Amino acid sequence: MSSSGMPDLPAPLTNIKIQHTKLFINNEWHDSVSGKTFPVFNPATEEKICEVEEADKEDVDKAVKAAREAFQMGSPWRTMDASERGQLIYKLADLIERDRLLLATLESINAGKIFASAYLMDLDYCIKVLRYCAGWADKIQGRTIPVDGEFFSYTRHEPIGVCGQIFPWNAPMILLACKIGPALCCGNTVIVKPAEQTPLTALHVASLIKEAGFPPGVVNIVPGYGPTAGAAISSHMDVDKVAFTGSTEVGKMIQEAAAKSNLKRVTLELGAKNPCIVFADADLDSAVEFAHQGVFTNQGQSCIAASKLFVEETIYDEFVQRSVERAKKYVFGNPLTPGVNHGPQINKAQHNKIMELIESGKKEGAKLECGGGPWGNKGYFIQPTIFSNVTDDMRIAKEEIFGPVQQIMKFKSLDEVIKRANNTYYGLVAGVFTKDLDKAVTVSSALQAGTVWVNCYLAASAQSPAGGFKMSGHGREMGEYGIHEYTEVKTVTMKISEKNS
């Protein structure tokens, strides 16, 4: 254990044999009904890792049936003490911690994550999320209500039922934990569809679900494509809720499918173009580093990236200079290699999309300060890229890039920057850097975002809720608010012969 409290960093595993490539339904491994599989690739080498069974509508039907049976009244899961539910989630967290090295290595190979980041940050957060949720299992309580008349009234917080959970490829282990943790602690059953690009860690966790002792059907994991498996979950008449993290475009489709089927509950965490505002009175060293990490962590592949950076004009030139110096310090290469701190984008499609947006910045008149092109002859690498002299009407200032591209814009006044920061369809997170407390409170109140970080960035935690305003989605994940997204409140009122205070 290091002096910071983080575990020491071991070497990644070598010559890993992929053990789990089938669908996990009812605590058993299944081939797909269609017999189809799909390839999974290493984005750093472009080499195929393995083939994984491809879930389709028929496989989703099997998973939903298993989840529904596990949720029936009188089932082992429904009759289990809440404290025992919590113990199962604690056990799952312990098993993930035991297999931390394997999971971090898989995350690095399959998702292109820097190994140190996967091991020290992603897996650490995943374990903390599950333990936080485990602690909530026997603390979800209703209320007694002093209603008028000769009645006794109380509320129950009941599990919603069968929950579909769909998430993308940029943080597979974190997203898996943030989905299943709250759902399971409330007593729901789940059908998980990980991204087709990155199913391997979720499938290993499936084996740990069974080892931990969860009853059959409580957790089902069905890798597949969005238009088939994802659509089947969203439109299924026997799924009670769907939680989705991904693009706004797909989020709209999921909400529409939910409405047109059985009006299932929906939680959405969608696209973003997050403003980060640096005032002249900020600690410049700290602001440069936080803003840098905010956009370049995980090669910019983050819905909470600081992708719309506003810097007050009196410090603008120095801020740009320091940011460029920082961005030039990266070491590219295989994410498993010690010392490498900049990995690949997830696939060719994302690589091409990011490069197209970089080219648009050049054409529309932004000043390219560094980067601006691909790196290497193999793998989907893009150089950390910084643009200055960016204006609000440029595509790079308006569209979610999801890559290692920092746009630095200039502002003059507080009122101006608030208006410009809010001039977007999105509202997921924001950052504010200032030593002025009044300014910090004023701006954080005015920004239309579900999370505002002051003098920090990427400071997410299991205890704090996260979610979006506007087209960045609705509902919350994590914290007490996120737990209650997985319950229905039932009111029970009884006639009594006499009521006393």
UniProtKB/Swiss-Prot annotation:
It is an enzyme of class 1 (oxidoreductase). GO terms for molecular function: aldehyde dehydrogenase (NAD+) activity; NAD binding. It comes from the Eukaryota. Its EC number is 1.2.1.3. Eye specific, with very high expression in the lens. Keywords: Cytoplasm, NAD, Oxidoreductase. It catalyses: an aldehyde + NAD(+) + H2O = a carboxylate + NADH + 2 H(+). GO terms for biological process: ethanol catabolic process. The active site is at 269 (proton acceptor), 303 (nucleophile). Pathway: Alcohol metabolism; ethanol degradation; acetate from ethanol: step 2/2. Pfam families: Aldedh. Its main location: cytoplasm. SUPFAM superfamilies: ALDH-like. PROSITE patterns: ALDEHYDE_DEHYDR_CYS (PS00070). The record marks 170 as: Transition state stabilizer. One of its GO terms (cellular component) is cytoplasm. It is found in: Cytoplasm. Belongs to the aldehyde dehydrogenase family. Homotetramer. Major component of the eye of elephant shrews, which in contrast to other mammals, possesses both a lens- and a non-lens class-1 aldehyde dehydrogenase 1. This eye-specific form is a structural protein of the lens and, in other part of the eye, serves as the major form of ALDH1. Can convert/oxidize retinaldehyde to retinoic acid. This is Aldehyde dehydrogenase, cytosolic 1. It comes from Macroscelides proboscideus. The gene is ALDH1.
